[in-house]
């Protein structure tokens, strides 16, 4: 009987722990949050119980504190943060790159420390599309401008066109010149906050061959004229740069 009640209590404790995990009251890992430079971001705390004491920290440094109903913000966060005294959620305004870090919230009313990792991103620029001919194929590359250095590792690539190649999530794709080429292809860059798209017309990647064909076709014409002139001159029919003999036979 005792064993049965112990098992029941253990099951009950396990159920409570699972519920706490589900509702976010126990946090073993940092929740990833994304914000944009000069924007704002909120660390949401799932609590409906009014909190009398709250401490927010960035690593080991204090960010904001609520104690005895008195709110204080610290260092560079002064006049840039708002604390919801009911839930404990913290909002940071006018984000800068230096705000990026791990934040944690502590309160006697919450079982464990809440942790968040903030990524501060810059607006995503439009991609640059270039193309080149390589061994009978057209290579199209989608590139990020060199000056953009904000979390390149978070950027994903996607293509849009009716061909199989566009299903790849890579920085470059290839098209055979003998295939029916799509009129336009698009490349999209995306990260957790932004996406931008650029397009290119594939036919502009192929150099025009019409002028080269006419140029090469005209080459034999002057050669034929020169050859004919030489043959006629050698046979005495055409005399170049010679005046006729006007001496009187008398």
From Swiss-Prot:
Domain spans labelled Ig-like: 30-121
Result for mutant: residue 49 to Q: No effect on CD2-binding
S-S bridge residues: 142-187
Signal peptide location: 1-28
Glycan-linked positions: 40, 94, 109, 135, 169, 195
Effect after changing residue 113 to S: No effect on CD2-binding
Cytoplasmic side stretches: 239-250
Single Gene Ontology BP annotation: cellular response to tumor necrosis factor
One Gene Ontology MF term: signaling receptor binding
UniProt keyword Transmembrane, yes or no: yes
Superkingdom of origin: Eukaryota
Record has Transmembrane helix as a keyword: yes
Extracellular-facing ranges: 29-215
Keywords: Cell membrane, Disulfide bond, Glycoprotein, Immunoglobulin domain, Membrane, Signal, Transmembrane, Transmembrane helix
A Gene Ontology term for the protein's cellular component: plasma membrane
InterPro entries registered for this protein in UniProt: CD2/SLAM_rcpt, Ig-like_dom_sf, Ig-like_fold
Transmembrane region(s): 216-238
Function: Ligand of the T-lymphocyte CD2 glycoprotein. This interaction is important in mediating thymocyte interactions with thymic epithelial cells, antigen-independent and -dependent interactions of T-lymphocytes with target cells and antigen-presenting cells and the T-lymphocyte rosetting with erythrocytes. In addition, the LFA-3/CD2 interaction may prime response by both the CD2+ and LFA-3+ cells.
Subunit structure: Interacts with CD2. Interacts with CMTM6.
Descriptive protein name: Lymphocyte function-associated antigen 3
Organism: Homo sapiens (Human)
């Amino acid at each position: 009987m005792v064993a049965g009640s112990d098992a029941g209590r253990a099951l009950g404790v396990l159920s409570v722990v699972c519920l706490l995990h589900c509702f976010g009251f126990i946090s073993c890992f940092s929740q990833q949050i994304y914000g944009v430079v000069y924007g704002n971001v909120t660390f949401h705390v799932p609590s409906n119980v009014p909190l009398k004491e709250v401490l927010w920290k960035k690593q080991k440094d204090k960010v904001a504190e609520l104690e005895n109903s008195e709110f204080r913000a610290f260092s560079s966060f002064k006049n840039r943060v708002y604390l919801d005294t009911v839930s404990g959620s913290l909002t940071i305004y006018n984000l800068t790159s230096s705000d990026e870090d791990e934040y944690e919230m502590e309160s006697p009313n919450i079982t464990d420390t809440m942790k968040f990792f903030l990524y501060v991103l810059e607006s995503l620029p439009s991609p640059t599309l270039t193309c080149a001919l390589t061994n009978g194929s057209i290579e199209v590359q989608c590139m990020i401008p060199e000056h953009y250095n904000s979390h390149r590792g978070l950027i994903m690539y996607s293509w849009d066109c009716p061909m199989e190649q566009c299903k790849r999530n890579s920085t470059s794709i290839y098209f055979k010149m003998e295939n029916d080429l799509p009129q336009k292809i698009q490349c999209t860059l995306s990260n957790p906050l932004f996406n931008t798209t650029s397009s290119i017309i594939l036919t502009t990647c192929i150099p025009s061959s019409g002028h080269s064909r006419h140029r090469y076709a005209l080459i034999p014409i002057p050669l034929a004229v020169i050859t004919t002139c030489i043959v006629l001159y050698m046979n005495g029919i055409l005399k170049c740069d010679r005046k006729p003999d006007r001496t009187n036979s008398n």
